[in-house]
Structure formats: structure tokens, C-alpha cells
């Protein structure tokens, strides 16, 4: 079919372009490309005492040697993986990495938003790979749009919602089983990464561009949270502590109300909204509501 013809043509174009350059030139371009990222940060944990030992043996012997230089190497390996799998213009780093070789990979190679996707990007700002957030931030922008329909249909609410998974089509609804799927706070966690990018860069124009995403996520929680009857706290219900069970439930109960994780994520989100609105001098009425709500979480 036409699709196969296109794939062959595209593959040939890549090969033709590659063959225009010698091996030495291609290797130099490759090394230079990675070096400009990797050399921004170094981690010195002392002398390399095992430099004549192969890496597989160093890993095998780590319990006995406590090989500090291997730890520093592993630190850079983590940065290398993000450099490989999150180049601007592409897709974000997923559960399996860019070189997955299976038609049906584990967990569908999706984006799991109840910690995995966030963990992939924890090193981005603190290890000076800030621009590699671009695919991730584009995903957040896209789920903030698709999540508006989910918020309206599932919860009758304004704003946007994301549950524990999304994919290349930017799904946002609850899926899989209750211990993981019935968790509507993925959007709040992703918003934290937008706010942290501003904290690291001080980029006012970036903050201005993502403020509506923060605000609409906060609006969703403002509309769906309910009062806890004893203390009059605002809580998310139903929800869960992702992939966790309640103590005392014999490992059976998962769906809950007012989970600590939700409380912290939403308090953090509203705090970011309040601070951002003060910096941008905007939405003061909404900010007042958010400040009141945050005190009741």
C-alpha cells in the first residue's frame, strides 16, 4: 500500500543522507551532539578505584565494593537516557524508551502519570537539561485540551482532568482497574513541572503561556472537591492512593476519599496558581477563591 511505499522512501532518504558522510565524520557529529548536553554537569564522588574492571563486573560487585565512581557513571547514564528519548520536536520519554522493539510492549509503553512520567523528568531541570522538557510540556498542553471533554463528560465540571494514563492520542479518562485508574489528580502533578520550569528559569513569558493550564486544572478541583463531614475539609472523592491499599482492609480496599497524595498535589497546585497570578498581576478574584480553598484542603 501507499503507507509501505512511504515508509520505504523515508527509510531510503535517511540512509542516503547518512551515506553522504564518512564514518569518522558521523561519529564526531554524534559525540559532539551528546557532549554539549553531558558536559554541562559533572558529579565527582572520588577516585575511580576500579577503572580496569568491566562495567558488568562493577555492577555485580557493587554490594561489596560500594563503587562510588559507578554511581557517578549511573548518574550520567540517567541523563543520557533522557537525552536519547526526549529531543525537542519528538514525543516525551515513555515507559519503555524510544527503542522499544515489541508490537505489544509492557503497559502498552504508555505515559503513566501517577509517578512514572514525572520521574522521567525529575532530572531535567536540576541536571541542566531544561530544553529536553519541550516534548513533555507539549504533552501537558495537549492533555489540558483533551482533558476538558473528560472533565465535562465524567464529572460535569469545567477545567481539565487527567487520570493515571495517557498515550500518543492524549487520552485523559479513567482506565484499567480501580487501584490505579480511579485517580483524577494526574493533571495537578503535571502542572508542578510547568511551575518548576518557571522557578528554575525565571521565564515570565513561559509562565504567562502556561498560567491558563494551571488555572484550568485548579478550576476542575474547585468544582469537584467535596466537604469532609467531620472537619469540613475539601477533599477529592472518589480517588485512591495510586496502586495502594488501605491498611486494615486485608489488602482489598483501594477507592478512598481525601488521600494524602491528592491533598498535597492540589495544595501545591493552588499555591502555584496564587504565586503565578501575583507575579503576572492577573485573575485576582480567582486567586482569592484558590487561596480560600487551599486553606481547607
Task: Place the predicted regions along the sequence by residue.
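Extended, hydrophobic/aromatic-rich amphipathic alpha-helical segments that build helical scaffolds
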Residues: 71-85, 187-196, 212, 216-221
